[in-house]
Amino acid sequence: MPVRMYDVSPRVFCAMQNLDITLLASYPEAEIRPVLPSLVRMSLLSPLDNTESSMESRKEILAVLIGIEVVNSIVSYLQVNYHELENELKKELQARQKSAFFEGQQHEYGLQSGIALGFERADVARKVRVVLSEIFNLQQQVSEQKPAAHSEMLDDGIYLEEVVDILCIALAELPSLLNILELTDALVHVPNGHRIICALVANFPDCYRDVVSHVIANCDEDGSDGKHRLMLLMGLSEMNPSQALANRSMCVDMLKVPSFMLKLTLKHPEDLIAFLTGLLLGNDQNLRSWFAAYIRSSQKRKGDALNLVRVELLQKVIQTTTNAAELRDFNLQGAVLLRLYCALRGIGGLKFNDDEINALSQLVTSCPQATPSGVRFVTLALCMLIACPSLVSTIPLENKAVEWLQWLIREDAFFCKRPGTSTSLGEMLLLLAIHFHSNQISAISEMVCSTLAMKIPIRPNSTNRIKQLFTQDLFTEQVVALHAVRVPVTPNLNGTILCYLPVHCIQQLLKSRTFLKHKVPIKSWIFKQICSSVRPVHPVMPALVEVFVNTLIIPNPTGKVNIDHMHRPFTEAEILHVFRTSKLTFFAEELPPMAESQELNQIEVTCPLTAQLLMIYYLMLYEDTRLMNLSALGGRKQKEYSNNFLGGLPLKYLLQKAHHYHNDYLSLFHPLLRLIISNYPHLSMVDDWLEEHNLAQGNSTVVVSKHELKPETLDRALAAIQTKPHLAIRVFKQLLQMPPETQAQYGQQLVKHLPMVFAKSVPRYVKDLYNDIWLRLNAVLPTTLWIMSLRAITNGSDTMDRRTFANESLLEPMEVLSCPRFVFCSPYLLMILLRILKGSLAASKTYLNVHMQMQQKQVLDKNGMMQTDAIWEDLRTTLIASQESAAVHILLEVLDYIASKATDRVSHLELREIQGIIGTYVHQAFISEPSLAKLVHFQTYPKSVIPMMVASVPSMHICIDFVHEFLNVTEMEKQIFTIDLTSHLVLNYSIPKSLGVSKFCLNVIQTTLSMLTASTKCRFLRNVMPAMVRFVETFPILADDCVNILMTTGRILHSQSSLGMTTMEMPLTDSDKLCTYRDAQLHIIMIEDAFKALVTAVMKKSDLY
């Protein structure tokens, strides 16, 4: 009578894996019974090699099998003709596929007395056939997704041993029909299927990993067969416990069977916390989402695996809390548990039960030692109180939390900053209190998530209890303000410090106007923090400066606090304290000395560049905010920084440094650049940026000279520059190798000799070197350099006070052009002058915008007329346009003057160079403001300059679009100028549109000639005749129109010469007749000459025909 099959033990499976026959021989017969099929088959098969070791192994297997009665029946299964059986089974499978009723006719498989009794009485071959047919029937039901029918052989445990024996041998003998993975999919649906599969895997241990991965990949816990597959996986894991972690890894990789994964983890409880932490806080977002979804769904159906995990975690929390005094790494273990429970709650949505809440409350309110790890534990515990509101859901729990927080405040070791650390718990408590007072739950959520290093949702309504604790019981608003200002500034504050700092607290308090409300001064603290900042700049520092400036100027939106009683801007002495180490501050002139207080002298500037950039950002933002809120000030006097003071600070140099260290000043460079472009456009001109880039490319390496350049040496070289230029060349090259900070020290000496350097007798190479030095100085502190350059050019330092682009002197661009005539005749001086002129016009435009805004607001305050906007806008536009057009006209008149004085070859070369310089300036002016071109040409300029303008200004082609409008003007001079301009334009731009404009000009000429008197007609024709020739030269098709104009004009002049100037003036005397005849001859000669010129122009274009 068959007996029930024993499950495969782990040691038997291990011995089968290693084929350790000695161990198998030492195990009881019942224990090795499931693996006998493989052992019997190995003993009967002929070995592949006949080595001595192979023979010994075979003897050992036979020794194990001797005396086991069931071996004989297994041997009989091996004697079946499997080749013939395979053919029969194939036919059966084909018949199953063809007939839908096959399974109904094969229930008994040819057995007369039923399957169970017939199976016992059948011969060996029939038994094998019955078992395999039963398997095929089961596979067919599974493939058709039908519920598995009852099977006497597979459901009853008394036949399992024989079924396993047959299947093990059939798997080896019939590989084309049977596959262990397919068998697994079929057998998993029967009650004893997991035991059969485990026995099969034990006989084929090399298939273990394939079977496990196959079952995991196809397992759905919510499916109908999920429970059976879980039983199979647990059976396989118990059979081979050494692979438990490997199986768990497969679950994680495939994102399958989380219950099995957790049960495997519980077999290694020491690894539980680390494993769960990795799932929820790892870098794999898909894994985190998958496990979080499992936690939520498992809570609904009360999954046993999750409950077991919660029980184990709860025991660990209780054990850790109970043994806190004895554990050396309590802080570390507690911090890990806190983060894990926060992740389970925030990411997985786990709802704590009462036991977990009490245990976690006990853990959170622990009082560790004041060590760095203790501070870390307490910080995480504080964040967990906020992230898990259930920890303060009852009055006892709330009281316990309040006592713990009060203990934190009393403990200076926790509340105050510890040596060697960048933050303190007190700063974090302050910042939380600030956020709670201002009801900024999103900022609290961001802070908690950042501290816990996880993204968890914190809803506003869930924080009401903890908010009440902070704002009413612990930190009132006044306590927060008074304590925050006494917190020391963060030394060496930089962007790599990611924790929450005092600067965060101050920034939030300033933003909420708490300091103003409770009359707490804060300027000194902010100044110290600016001086203690280093690069890379902390991202909150620009925000701190911005909110400080807003507090100084912008009124409180609620209107409850008068802002004029407390905060004060930085004084000039404080600002100069930051710039005291700079070699570039006021290198042209010194301001009156300012006394520094003893407290100010004790403040050390850690990183001068960072502090100076922050202070410049403050100044730019302060001025911009003040000007934008003039109406909001309501007549209240607000501090203004003098223009001379602002002009002496190296704004442009610092902006370049911020651009050079762009990554270190990422949060500061862009807003600073925006402010400078808006308020100081002369410091951010395109030409300067391109010039500085080219200089940086050409001199990428700065060589520090071993020998310092003495001022006496520089003066001596500059004084003898005309007689001994080699001295100047050597000195200038040495200067070019110096960094800009060092060059600036010699700026006053260099600029003082500016006219002497650019004298005609000085070699051009020396001028080029000096020009490079001037451009380098211009890149450092341009406003001061421009002032000194203008003084040197005008040779009247007494008549020109110190001027910057924020006051009236240099705001008038015409004063820049009021220079001696030799300046315009020197190409180098002219380039310097035009660079200053561009900056002057840019600054003047900004000043007029601000001035218009101020005046406009004042007018609106008086009468509120809507027309005021347009009136002031028109005035501003008109004034700016008049300044720009006046500058262009002056330059064009200079060009006309120089052209009139050009007599020799050298002067013509200088004229050509100056023409290119002025043409480039005019071109840029026309491109930036196209309407300026229309205004300049409407006002006209010397006709002799027109050819040079067309040749040297590429943007002159835009005049073709509007030049026809000027021909409608009745003034003859403007018509002549327009026709002459048009002729040069069409000669240079022979495009279809030019042909239409040319025809229009000829029509105007013809119409005008028909309406003029004889003398006026001749004068007009004499002026437009060269233009007509250029029209014909460009478009020969216009020759007929020009000839027609000449012939008509000639007939009219001839007729009038015979009658007099008019029909009423008959020539009565001989002298009058002679005079009239002489004039007529001259007119006829002029027309003949014009006709010859036309013919010549047409002949030049003969190649077109």
UniProtKB/Swiss-Prot annotation:
InterPro entries: Int2_metazoa, INTS2. GO terms for biological process: positive regulation of gene expression; positive regulation of neuron differentiation; RNA polymerase II transcription initiation surveillance; snRNA 3'-end processing; snRNA processing. The keyword Nucleus applies. It is a single-pass membrane protein. Belongs to the Integrator subunit 2 family. PANTHER family: INTEGRATOR COMPLEX SUBUNIT 2. This is Integrator complex subunit 2. It comes from Drosophila melanogaster (Fruit fly). The gene is IntS2.
